[in-house]
């Protein structure tokens, strides 16, 4: 369960407060599948970072009773002067994986990412597409109670995108999901409730179609 209690988030710009949202509250039950909708610039990605505990609210409290992924496919966490294999091992150690678990996860990512010999080369030599494939594979190598998606659910060409889509669908079948997306077909497939953010306010919808209708009319 995730309980968001009266949170406010702002950034100081030139000494002035730029308020993204204030006094937001909602509860997502275990296994809940939540879409975060709204116009650009209203703080959807910031809200995800708050939920993942990457950032903290200026006011209010977020309580979590389950584990949360980092945003699926996030590429900024790699260390460029390590190889793909070394990066995955490093993340495994951060999660206190046993030696046997490390080898299983490394093998999974190596097979899924399909980067060939580059898996044992420095990440700094990768193309952007290769980094994305490695990142998605790493995201899927770990089990979480909630999976977080910030726009990108699949990467690469049509073949690899379908591969990502199929794997995520299987991986998250009985898990919670928190998704920011402008693709309403994807939202319909994976989410059953939504929040709509706009003008520093939050509107919670228990029926996904109601939220999509509002989003479509406002777009």
Predicted region positions:
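H-loop (His-switch) and adjacent beta-strand-loop-beta switch element
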Residues: 190-207, 215
């Amino acid at each position: 369960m995730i309980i968001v209690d009266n949170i406010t988030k702002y950034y100081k710009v030139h000494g002035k407060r730029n308020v993204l949202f204030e006094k937001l509250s909602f509860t997502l039950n275990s296994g809940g599948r939540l879409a975060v909708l709204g116009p650009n610039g209203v703080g959807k990605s910031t809200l995800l970072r708050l939920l993942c505990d990457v950032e903290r609210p200026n006011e209010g409290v977020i309580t979590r009773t389950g584990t949360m992924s980092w945003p699926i496919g996030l590429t900024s966490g790699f260390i460029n002067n390590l190889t793909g294999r070394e990066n995955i091992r490093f993340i495994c150690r951060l999660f206190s994986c046993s030696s046997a678990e490390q080898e299983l996860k490394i093998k999974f990512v190596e097979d899924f990412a399909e980067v060939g010999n580059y898996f044992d080369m420095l990440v700094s030599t990768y193309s952007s597409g290769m980094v994305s494939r490695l990142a998605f594979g790493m995201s899927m190598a770990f089990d979480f109670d909630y999976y977080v998606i910030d726009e990108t659910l699949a990467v690469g060409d049509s073949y690899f995108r379908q591969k990502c889509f199929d794997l995520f669908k299987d991986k998250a079948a009985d898990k919670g999901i928190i998704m920011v997306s402008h693709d309403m077909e994807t939202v319909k497939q994976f989410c059953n409730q939504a929040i709509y953010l706009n003008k520093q306010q939050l509107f919670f919808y228990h029926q996904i179609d109601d939220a999509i209708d509002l989003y479509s009319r406002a777009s």
